């Protein structure tokens, strides 16, 4: 039996030792598949699954969300999932995993699909029918199903053969016969797409073409995905016959042509269909046109916008996915408020003259970044109507307030007994995703009294569901919510239009209808780049220029997922970009232009301009690979400096400015940032079970000069070795462990290597591995050219030939000091040759070059350029240069005795005494990290023994620091000990940290924080504690330390920290920097104190510590966090803390008493549902739906955690346990009743409907079935397993009104049992002791006279009677109008 102290213990749960507070449910679990964060989490799981080979489980979770939980929209997830197209994946490619997503039945393996799962084509039929405003005909169904069936069969064969190959160890482990079988399947699939795609849009009927276009869009996506796999994986599958270099070139041509063809086809068919709607004459035809636009946008255009990303030449495979944000907006939903012809949109006039940014359909609708919804003010009225003297509610007007203005829709009467106005405040961080409507119907003119044949209607109440599942009520009275208007998945309500009710009666000028503007949730997010995931991968990001901060003119564009920005001659535009991780990015623009146009491009990093030059935006009219849109042909253009295609961008907010310096318009779609990723040598599995070495990579003409190895051995694998070879000679050997061990190694390879192989061993050497390099490969024949890279060692020889005012880059790589360049040249004329050294695209050194030359660059540089400056007339130079990277020869270690002396002094200063068993009082954890960096820099050759001894002492200091630290994992060595936001990650390899650090990214759609609580039992009474840490970079970082009420709460601005050059006696951090507004930044090291008085083990306040980002573009990198004992409190300090603690305890006890009074009755009632009060056990046999519905969950004051806004508080956890217990009881009741969906939680599923039976929502939140009159009924035929004619059953019914339940049974002779229910209020009635003459029983619910509301019905086996019970047809009833479990959702 559940008791109070179990659910609401006197000692709250231990944050570290117990299960942490769970995340709040996504909005999708509350109402609609709305919350983008749910999709993002499932996408992360799929990405991990593809690389780990467990993708079928990840897809099964998606299918469960679609078909069981109803929290995911199929179409939306697939569209978002296509962002994985650029991932570096194993040799199976990306098409194979997606087969199980497109066709649920093919997601086999160890994770079969849900029983009711459909393929994506079947799942989108309801939307297609809604778009064409009719049901698909039998012929249309046969046509569509037949085509898709043929594709599914081909996909199944492809999948099966790929599985067979992988089960044998991969393509290099199987014979040519199996490879041929697979390539035949590949080519068959390719032929199917080529041959059958056109049939979906070539029918001679307009409807057939329109209904086929969503199919066409999905199939085109599948085809492009297959072609991309052929291009990127084909040489691995079959490089000798079907996928030779020439064949791959042919497929590259195919994918480019198909991208253009598929995009144009979708756009042309969409435009043709749009034109067929003409100019709408009323709101009904207007709404149909907008519904067409909505379905075509989400099912077709949103897919077509992604087609160019399938081209591997344009979007090559990298370490991360690709995210192209959408900003296009949709008019949806349409809500009738007051009409003359029932509550429909029919014959209702449309007036858009008062709609901002509508522009007769050619506008962009209100920009959600400029017009942010603040409040709705509704003006209702209740007055005696002209029909029957009834009080009728009307919505006179609605006032929409945004950040720009307040606009009134409708008009206020001069005199009227108004009720209101009613206010709805809108939180932009928790936007509206659904609108519910309560209606009031009135009888037609001349009728007497109430009549269900309704001809007039108005809205009596509105409520708005927010993304987190909470509901905002607009009041106005009213009864049940009978209509739900959900926005498209992952959208929110960014604006609300109104149109007047224009008639000749007294109600003219009222609001006739409301029209929502649905906006993608990412549209208002900051433009964030450089955000790593858990594996450290950084995505390619694309931001519509529609998100610009100034400039340009918005023009309608259908195909890009965003409207275009027209940049006319002389106009400028600027877009802010926030970078989380400093590094190199390729910047690209997607645009359209009818003429060659010069655009001045300025990347302003606030102190530097890495790009500040005029760029030619060439005419795109005749571009063969561009995509046609409404404003021209769109192409992608790289924005490069004169010497580098990548741009160094610091970790901060920068601004990109473009100015049209030409004479023609340029239409800007988006700006893209592609992170520089390390060259990938190999990614996939290795296996030597055949007995031969596994050659991962080899080349006849290219060498790499360094290597990064990362992987994990299989559990059955033994240890082995990796060989790096150069022309057959083993250059380096790297150990590869076995038995599930992970491994990581990185080495320079000065000699260069052109082959990587895993040595064979018995019984097996196998696992997964990623092999990369820090730098691109170099020609092994020492060929020259423009560009090059950091070859290291003696690699990197360049031939150069310059004339006139020419230049060439001979090195581009990591930032280094001491790069060595030598060579010679011949010349004509009188040349001056200059060697320019660059750092972050800025010249840091210019050195004259004479032949022969031998130059060492003394400054830090990441790029070298040879520049020819003719002194007198024309000149030429021809020569050779060899660049040697310092990563081989450059030695930064400390070798002088004074260095050893300085570092030894600093090591000893870490300790309080010579015994080294206690740290000095003022030493922080970060102090230890700075010292270890210096110890590690001591020369092994000169001070080997001393270095070893000093490192031992520093290790001891680190152990002592961890022992005194009350936080677990203060340097994130135990990441699981922290609560963290969904996108918060740990990162290594920072110049200021020896340990890992945490990256708190910009919040986005979910908060960005870390949090930990130190339990009371760990503290000492009357003691001061120090809370400290090191911030390498912090923008809008809030530091909170709380015991009795957030004693420390401070937002800091810490500029990006850059290490000083490492010296033996100087600090590691940091040159002084100012914040973005020019003020001096906060210090990198923070330290606060918090006082603990008497311990309170019962209340357990402890010390709570958290860091979080409080602004959308904030970010932070933090480590070395500590809470440690400082000193005992003085007498006056004890008195002060006692006073604070006493006040806190008073409020604490008051709140607990209030909560206890609310939850104890609920605990008692839930205990009554279960045998022995065991909430995890079985419910009692006499429990009915009404017993569950009668339990009303309380409203507790604090459901969210006080710091972590996306997690439950202790009270929220209690509510979740209550709801879980009710859900389990309900599920058991569902299993015990013979009727399916007897509670009507799934609308009228499993029931056959006659007449106008439909589901409605009552004012208290209950969903019930409404039978409006005697012509309405629902029925269900059940089949009883293990039928026994002597078995007795009980019928339990809960409803309101006058109706009957009939049970028809018998085979040769029909028997009908009738149960009558006549109650004015919601009442439970029962019929006991029923027996049946056959195993098939038809149950029918009918209305007898007027409205009959059905809450639930159950038919259950009767328990065995006791001696004093009589089961002969007993009936009973009880009245109860309490709310159901559904009102607490």
From Swiss-Prot:
**Top-level taxon in the UniProt lineage:** Bacteria
Q: Where is the composition biased (Low complexity)?
A: 1370-1385
Family annotation (Pfam families): Cry1Ac_D5, Endotoxin_C, Endotoxin_N
List, in alphabetical order, the GO biological process terms annotated in this UniProt record: sporulation resulting in formation of a cellular spore; symbiont-mediated killing of host cell
Q: Give the span(s) annotated as Disordered.
A: 768-799, 1359-1385
Q: Which UniProt keywords apply?
A: Sporulation, Toxin, Virulence
- Tell me where the transmembrane regions lie: none
List all Gly residues biased stretches: 782-796
MF terms in GO: toxin activity
- The answer, when asked if Zinc is one of the entry's keywords, is no
Give the family, as the similarity comment puts it: Belongs to the delta endotoxin family.
User: What task does this protein carry out?
Assistant: Endotoxin with nematicidal activity.
More about this protein: Toxic segment of the protein is located in the N-terminus.
Protein name as annotated? Pesticidal crystal protein Cry5Aa
